């Protein structure tokens, strides 16, 4: 079976114009008001469960669901950082469950929530917030019920469309997310601005899917013009999310 790639999805959905046109510096961080469905309401509290370490299904959706990763270094005696991590178009949370990414999160006892989008990509990419925000809110509520989370160390991140969504959702919900980690984003389109989170953006110079000149370089310039604290790393590579970039992003998240 042919796997839907980010290129296939953007072209078939007619979104390639959107992914570049939204990145002219004058409107790269422009507010796109939404009627409703943009805010996250779950907040950390006192957990009522004692989770087993490891990767566990969220158990919140049929078909498309996601995972929560509880590192072996987690202890309920100390509040942990939390990262919401979002996949690219045509992918799923499972894209993040292979390899050795867990080792990067284990060092700092970072709890990771990895939701699936309700459709092939995230709702805002289609131009309407709602279903994915509600699902992420439920996933956060589950994480806060299971794990003791530091309210001052909550981040949202993602790759490709997931990075676009992380930037947009994170700025919209900056009263929850203090840090945004975006790997190869296409654009940023918050519904409202609730604060100025710290932002890490990494992007490959040879990216042919979302060319860096049309995306991250414009996004970063626009964010800096609006006084967002941004760290931008360009690397030699294509449309990918490397272990090295993830490690750098986690260091940024943890203030190193």
Where is each model-derived feature located?
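A domain-start/cap signature at the N-terminus of enzymes
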Residues: 2, 10, 14-17, 22-81, ...
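Serine-hydrolase catalytic machinery in alpha/beta-hydrolase-like enzymes
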Residues: 59-72, 77-147
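Loop/turn elements at helix/coil->beta-strand transitions in domains of secreted/extracellular proteins
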Residues: 79-81, 108-111, 150-153, 175-179, ...
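Cell-envelope and extracellular/periplasmic
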Residues: 87-89, 144-147, 159, 163-166, ...
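Alpha-helical scaffolding within the catalytic cores
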Residues: 96-102, 183-192, 217
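Primarily recognizes the serine-hydrolase "nucleophile elbow" in alpha/beta-hydrolase
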Residues: 152-195
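C-terminal catalytic histidine-bearing segment of alpha/beta-hydrolase fold enzymes
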Residues: 202, 208, 213-220, 224-256
């Amino acid at each position: 079976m042919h796997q839907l790639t980010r290129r296939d999805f953007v072209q078939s959905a007619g979104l390639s114009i959107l992914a570049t046109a939204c990145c002219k510096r004058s409107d790269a961080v422009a507010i796109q008001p939404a009627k409703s469905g943009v805010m996250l309401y779950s907040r950390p509290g006192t957990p009522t469960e004692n989770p087993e370490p490891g990767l566990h299904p969220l158990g919140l959706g049929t078909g498309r669901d996601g995972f929560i990763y509880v590192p072996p270094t987690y202890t309920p005696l100390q509040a942990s950082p939390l990262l919401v991590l979002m996949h690219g178009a045509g992918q799923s949370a499972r894209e993040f469950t292979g390899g050795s990414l867990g080792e990067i999160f284990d060092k700092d006892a970072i709890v990771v929530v990895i939701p699936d989008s309700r459709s092939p990509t995230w709702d805002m990419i289609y131009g309407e917030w709602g279903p994915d925000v509600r699902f992420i809110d439920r996933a956060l509520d589950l994480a806060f019920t299971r794990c003791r989370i530091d309210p001052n160390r909550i981040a949202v991140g993602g790759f490709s469309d997931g990075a676009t969504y992380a930037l947009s959702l994170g700025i919209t919900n900056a009263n929850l997310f203090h840090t945004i980690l975006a790997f190869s984003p296409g654009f940023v389109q918050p519904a409202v601005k609730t604060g100025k989170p710290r932002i890490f953006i990494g992007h490959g110079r040879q990216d042919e899917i979302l060319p860096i000149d049309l995306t991250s370089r414009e996004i970063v310039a626009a964010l800096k013009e609006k006084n967002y604290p941004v760290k931008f790393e360009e690397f030699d590579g294509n449309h990918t999310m490397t272990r090295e970039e993830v490690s750098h992003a986690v260091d940024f998240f943890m203030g190193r």
